Amino acid sequence: EQTNEILDEPVAKTSADVIVVGGGGAGLAAAAGAAESGASVIIIEAAGFTGGAAMTSGGHMAMLNEEMNAAAERNDEDLYKYLDYQEEDFNEWAPSLTILKQQVTQYLASDQKGRFDSVERMIVDHYIKGKGMDLDGNEVSQDYELVKEALENNWEIFTWLQSGGMEIKDT
């Protein structure tokens, strides 16, 4: 049974197999996964609506899709910047940059049709766009292993979202 009831008053006693705190993209995915496995789920969301940061992103998601890439135009001009990056600036992310540089060099030298993309490109992009400073002035970045795991498995995530009825568009 699914309800979207917003409660103004506390309920005396409610139980579920899984309680998810937060109805953003990650919370909704966790709730959907638990429900698919047969668990009863309660989502607790302070905002009174679901979506979280996923609403402000418009649902954008980095996705490696070879079929869409093959149908697109080559993107040589977008790739040269990766060859200029230095591994020593990438800390634990450096191995992905090294592989990406090899991939880009091979692609640029080839007559391959379609847009270039790779898991390593997405990993490097996550590092570049995700690093910043904390309130104490220390450089911070995303968790490399977590980003790598998610991006290496993004096709499974893609097909899971589609199986749940999400419409995917190339942007």
Regions from the language model: what does each represent?
Residues L7, F49-T171:
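Conserved N-terminal/central alpha/beta ligand/cofactor-binding core
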Residues Q2-T3, A16, I43, D143:
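Generic, low-specificity signal for short hydrophobic/alpha-helical stretches with a mild N-terminal bias
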Residues A26-A29, F49:
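Conserved Rossmann-like nucleotide-cofactor binding loop
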Residues Q2-P10:
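Extended, non-globular alpha-helical segments
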Residues E9-A26, I42:
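Beta1/beta-strand and adjacent pyrophosphate-binding region of the FAD-binding site
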Residues A34:
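Aromatic pocket-lining residues of Rossmann-like dinucleotide-binding sites
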